Amino acid sequence: MKILVPATSANLGPGFDCLGLSLKYFNQTIVEKSKFFSISIHGEGENNIYLKKNNSFVNIFYEIYQRLSGKKDNFRFVFQNNIPLARGMGSSSAVIIGAIACAYELSGFKADKNTILNEALKYENHPDNIAPAALGGFVCALTHNEKVLAIKKEVDKDLQAVITIPNVAMNTQKSRAVLAKKINLEDGVFNLCHASFLTACFLEKKYDLLKYASLDKLHQNQRMKLLPELFEVQKLALDNNALMSTLSGSGSSFFTLAYKDDAKKIKEKIKNKFAKFRVELLEFDDEGFKIC
């Protein structure tokens, strides 16, 4: 079987650990029964020996497959990884969702996407990446009684994402370590208001208000200080008609939303100024993972 799992961009400014969306940029994995166990990795991580010795996809897959089927079969795994590692584009969530979906499919259990999503919560505590990876679209999600509750909205086809991918990784643990252990009431209320308003902007297609809705006081500036060029990326995007421009997940990638004509111009301007950074112009994915 073959599975495609999309990249995701989470937080979207004020929506810390609860908002995310899905991008048409996929990791592809082929999993087949085989006489012998084997792993082949192409693309991102292909030179990382650790990913072959202790592969999270493989570990999660076997854990669930053996639990569901009661068997210890050998499989051949072929990974075509396009999602950058440790760049805030949901590479870990793509692994988790992909492994679980494959395990259910190959053990003969037909599981819906909500089942896959709730299983994923055992491996990832926050739903902001796993929810759009499973469901597609723009997603607002929370956890309640060890279940994910998610509302999905398709993203307008007139919009595109400009993803700026620095040549520097940003480890999630390190990125969380710079955050304040306590927040003041004023900042908490600010983010509640802005996350709610941002969600309403997507639901009602009030995209012109996103530049106000996407402001944040809890995490973004603290993390961007780890790579100060990101402040310049954000300013350049907003000065050239971006609807919003925010840190993607915990970084180091940066997410910019714009109408298609503006998105092309923004991509070129960022690429011209930051030659060492990758800049991708991406459509939005409204399906989530796909089994082929």
From Swiss-Prot:
SUPFAM superfamilies: GHMP Kinase, C-terminal domain, Ribosomal protein S5 domain 2-like. It catalyses: L-homoserine + ATP = O-phospho-L-homoserine + ADP + H(+). InterPro entries: GHMP_kinase_C_dom (IPR013750), GHMP_kinase_C_sf (IPR036554), GHMP_kinase_N_dom (IPR006204), GHMP_knse_ATP-bd_CS (IPR006203), Homoserine_kinase (IPR000870), Ribosomal_Su5_D2-typ_SF (IPR020568), Ribsml_uS5_D2-typ_fold_subgr (IPR014721). It is found in: Cytoplasm. ATP binds at P84, L85, A86, R87, G88, M89, G90, S91, S92, S93, A94. GO terms for cellular component: cytoplasm. Pathway: Amino-acid biosynthesis; L-threonine biosynthesis; L-threonine from L-aspartate: step 4/5. One of its GO terms (biological process) is threonine biosynthetic process. Its EC number is 2.7.1.39. Keywords: Amino-acid biosynthesis, ATP-binding, Cytoplasm, Kinase, Nucleotide-binding, Threonine biosynthesis, Transferase. It comes from the Bacteria. One of its GO terms (molecular function) is homoserine kinase activity. Belongs to the GHMP kinase family. Homoserine kinase subfamily. PANTHER family: HOMOSERINE KINASE, HOMOSERINE/4-DIPHOSPHOCYTIDYL-2-C-METHYL-D-ERYTHRITOL KINASE. HAMAP family: Homoser_kinase. Catalyzes the ATP-dependent phosphorylation of L-homoserine to L-homoserine phosphate. This is Homoserine kinase. The gene is thrB.
